[in-house]
């Protein structure tokens, strides 16, 4: 089963194991630096979008810059899954796991529950690098089931999550629509179960 980790412990996608405290680390202020995916933008980096609704009601659009200048393989995977050019991708999939004051997770377009998904390179692909860090809200990072198990599942942070540095590959950040991410977050719970069905109704590439 795919999972996020908190330190050396797994945070299961469908439920939080008893060994994991329900209280997550408090939000911390972030400082701009070389590991911040939003600290500098390259004109060559792709901009993609996710249009999201909750129980059929539009929430808005999230625009993401993919850091192809730092993690080109990971960025290309996400870009192609947004456009659907490989014949599969994120359109119609859900944000299946949302934990307030932590993150919003999506990308399982096969099983829609956190147990599936696949990359454009096959089932899984290796961690590219850990240059970019989980510095604060809006960071875009890959979910995994351990080292070198990247597929299609991803998460958008709503706080600084530096305990995930070196364990999950950061590959982008929110350029526009953080208010939409906060709306998604509002439908989450400590267990990750959402109170409404949150669907990526459309997605693609802007530039």
Curated annotation (Swiss-Prot):
Regulation: Inhibited by cyclosporin A (CsA). Is displaced by CsA from the mPTP leading to a lower open probability of the mPTP.
Subunit and partners: Associates with the mitochondrial membrane ATP synthase F(1)F(0) ATP synthase; the association is increased by inorganic phosphate (Pi) and decreased by cyclosporin A (CsA). Interacts with ATP5F1B; ATP5PD and ATP5PO. Interacts with SLC25A3; the interaction is impaired by CsA. Interacts with BCL2; the interaction is impaired by CsA. Interacts with TP53; the association implicates preferentially tetrameric TP53, is induced by oxidative stress and is impaired by CsA. Interacts with C1QBP. Interacts with MCUR1.
Subcellular compartments: Mitochondrion matrix
Post-translational modification N6-acetyllysine, affected residues: 67, 167
Electron transport is among the record's keywords: no
Protein name: Peptidyl-prolyl cis-trans isomerase F, mitochondrial
Transit peptide residues according to the UniProt entry: 1-29
UniProt modified residues of type N6-succinyllysine: 67, 86, 175, 190
One example of a Gene Ontology biological process annotation: regulation of mitochondrial membrane permeability involved in programmed necrotic cell death
Function: PPIase that catalyzes the cis-trans isomerization of proline imidic peptide bonds in oligopeptides and may therefore assist protein folding. Involved in regulation of the mitochondrial permeability transition pore (mPTP). It is proposed that its association with the mPTP is masking a binding site for inhibiting inorganic phosphate (Pi) and promotes the open probability of the mPTP leading to apoptosis or necrosis; the requirement of the PPIase activity for this function is debated. In cooperation with mitochondrial p53/TP53 is involved in activating oxidative stress-induced necrosis.
Keywords: Acetylation, Apoptosis, Isomerase, Mitochondrion, Necrosis, Rotamase, S-nitrosylation, Transit peptide
Gene3D superfamilies: Cyclophilin-like
EC main group: isomerase
GO cellular component: cytoplasm; membrane; mitochondrial matrix; mitochondrial permeability transition pore complex; mitochondrion
Encoding gene per record: PPIF
């Amino acid at each position: 089963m795919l999972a996020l980790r908190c330190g050396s412990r797994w945070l299961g996608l469908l439920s939080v194991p008893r060994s994991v405290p329900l209280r997550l680390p408090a939000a911390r202020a972030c400082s701009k630096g070389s590991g911040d995916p939003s600290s500098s933008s390259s004109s060559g980096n792709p901009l993609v979008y996710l249009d999201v609704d909750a129980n059929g009601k539009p929430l808005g659009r999230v625009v993401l810059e993919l850091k192809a200048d730092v993690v080109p393989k990971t960025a290309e995977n996400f870009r192609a899954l947004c456009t659907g050019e490989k014949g599969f991708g994120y359109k119609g999939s859900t944000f299946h796991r949302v934990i307030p004051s932590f993150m919003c997770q999506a990308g399982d377009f096969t099983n829609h529950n956190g147990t599936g998904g696949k990359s454009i390179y096959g089932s899984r692909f290796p961690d590219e690098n850990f240059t970019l860090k989980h510095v604060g809200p809006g960071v875009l990072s890959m979910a995994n089931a351990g080292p070198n198990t990247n597929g299609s599942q991803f998460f958008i942070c709503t706080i600084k999550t530096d305990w995930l540095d070196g364990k999950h590959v950061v590959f982008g950040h929110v350029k526009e629509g953080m208010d939409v991410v906060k709306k998604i977050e509002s439908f989450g719970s400590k267990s990750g179960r959402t109170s409404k069905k949150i669907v990526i109704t459309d997605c693609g590439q802007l530039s």
